[in-house]
Amino acid sequence: MFKNTFQSGFLSILYSIGSKPLQLWDKKVRNGHIKRITDNDIQSLVLEIVGTNVSTTFITCPADPKKTLGIKLPFLVMIIKNMKKYFTFEVQVLDDKNVRRRFRASNYQSTTRVKPFICTMPMRLDEGWNQIQFNLSDFTRRAYGTNYVETLRVQIHANCRIRRVYFSDRLYSEDELPPEFKLFLPIQKPVQKSNAICS
């Protein structure tokens, strides 16, 4: 999808305020909903994904299962609200051994498990809005001893609210971020930054 585009700085794949936030995504809903609502904390439109079973309600990008993202930027950043319910997301990457690896982070797991094609890890979310920063290059190296080449697919499951999902070439401080990539809270409460842990 983005393989032949010049990639530097920021590359956004979901913005809840955009005219078509799920333009690049496919959605699956069973016993739940995916809809745009106004979040009271930030007084802004967000995408809400809610389901009784995290595995059956999710959004996935790209929408076409035969296509891949082809994003080479190594940092995945998601601005997500903790709904105090089970939540998981998954990223599929390609490494320099030409092997597809999946990283799955969830808030209901307590240990990291590394298997040949999937690494599952715990994720701790603070209350309210969180900025999840995922260093794909570092995770690929630590889990598999190989080098990250590109991201193929991103899948976000229930239960959460999403403001934005983007990739970046490095981690940026709050001051360096373009205004539309920041999360402005009406009462200026700083957004918690959390990292998924893969040990």
From Swiss-Prot:
Protein name per the record: Cilia- and flagella-associated protein 20
Disruption of the gene: reported phenotype: Flies are viable and develop until late pupal stages. Display defects in wing posture and inflation, in locomotion and climbing activities and have a reduced lifespan. Males produce immotile sperm and show defects in sperm individualization process within cysts. Display defects of polyglycylation incorporation in sperm axonemal microtubules.
A Pfam match: CFA20_dom
Keyword vocabulary terms for this entry: Cell projection, Cilium, Cytoplasm, Cytoskeleton, Differentiation, Flagellum, Microtubule, Nucleus, Spermatogenesis
Gene (UniProt): Bug22
Annotated compartments: Nucleus; Nucleus, Nucleolus; Cell projection, Cilium; Cytoplasm, Cytoskeleton, Microtubule organizing center, Centrosome, Centriole
Family: Belongs to the CFAP20 family.
The species this protein was found in: Drosophila melanogaster (Fruit fly)
Tissues expressing this chain: Expressed in spermatocytes and chordotonal organs in sensory neurons of the antenna.
Alphabetical list of InterPro entries matching this protein: CFA20/CFAP20DC, CFA20_dom
Gene Ontology biological process terms from the UniProt entry: cilium assembly; cilium organization; locomotion; mRNA splicing, via spliceosome; positive regulation of cell motility; positive regulation of flagellated sperm motility; protein polyglycylation; regulation of cilium beat frequency involved in ciliary motility
Entry-linked PANTHER family: ORF PROTEIN
GO cellular component term of the entry, any: catalytic step 2 spliceosome
Main location, first listed in the record: nucleus
Keyword Cytoplasm recorded: yes
Function per UniProt: Cilium- and flagellum-specific protein that plays a role in axonemal structure organization and motility. Microtubule inner protein (MIP) part of the dynein-decorated doublet microtubules (DMTs) in cilia axoneme, which is required for motile cilia beating. Involved in the regulation of the size and morphology of cilia. Required for sperm individualization, differentiation of the sperm flagellum and tubulin polyglycylation of axonemal microtubules.
Source organism superkingdom: Eukaryota
Electron transport as UniProt keyword: no
